[in-house]
């Protein structure tokens, strides 16, 4: 529950000022943001990010993107930030976003119901998206964790070590057991204040209560 997560976070903050230890009762099936609802965890754990994010008024605001403009009812032009790198040091470009979204769309049908992408064209930091029908809530869709960005050309298994753009990069993941992340010093938003985090997965809520 939200209460359990809040308590776990409070406990974690008291454990260490540099690396937090968090207890949670739920976990993803993998760290591959394209699978199921796993992107919600990679987003919450600071591994992946989206082009837009909701502000306190639930209005979409630019994040990895600088702007998103509707040219006509079926065409959107997205201009990306020029200072974002993946955890392997590669620059995030329109081509890398295009490749990531193509992969996610092939794996997860829910992605296609968010943005209804028909085709995309990448040019430097500009991505032009043509949709199969008008999508008035297109920018809201860009806030959904499933539309987060990873470097699909990166080495390694994205289900264990996805290469995202967030303040933290994946170190290890054991399903239903434990996850660990460490800070990405070159994060575009500034070096993270924490060195990392350990997320212990405790399926038994009674055990979680005792741990608190």
Positions of predicted regions on the chain:
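Surface-exposed binding/hinge segments that line
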Residues: 69, 110-152
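Aromatic- and charge-enriched surface segment that lines or borders ligand/interaction sites
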Residues: 66-107, 128
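Short, well-ordered beta-strand elements
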Residues: 16-29, 75-79, 97-100, 127-129, ...
């Amino acid at each position: 529950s939200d209460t359990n997560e809040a308590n776990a976070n409070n406990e974690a903050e008291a454990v260490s000022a540099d690396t937090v230890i968090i207890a949670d009762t739920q976990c993803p099936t993998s760290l591959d943001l394209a699978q199921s609802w796993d992107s919600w965890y990679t987003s919450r754990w600071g591994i992946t990010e989206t082009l837009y994010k909701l502000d306190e008024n639930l209005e979409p605001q630019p994040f990895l993107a600088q702007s998103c403009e509707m040219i006509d009812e079926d065409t959107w032009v997205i201009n990306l930030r020029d200072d974002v790198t993946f955890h392997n040091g590669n620059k995030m470009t329109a081509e890398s976003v295009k490749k990531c979204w193509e992969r996610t769309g092939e794996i997860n049908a829910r992605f296609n119901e968010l943005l209804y992408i028909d085709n995309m064209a990448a040019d430097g930091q500009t991505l032009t998206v043509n949709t199969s029908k008008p999508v008035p809530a297109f920018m809201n869709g860009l806030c959904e964790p499933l539309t987060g960005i990873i470097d699909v050309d990166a080495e390694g298994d994205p289900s264990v070590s996805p290469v995202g753009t967030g303040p933290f990069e994946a170190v290890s993941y054991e399903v239903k057991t434990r996850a660990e992340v460490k800070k990405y010093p070159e994060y575009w938003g500034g070096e993270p204040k924490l060195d990392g985090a350990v997320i212990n997965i405790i399926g038994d809520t009674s055990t979680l209560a005792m741990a608190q």
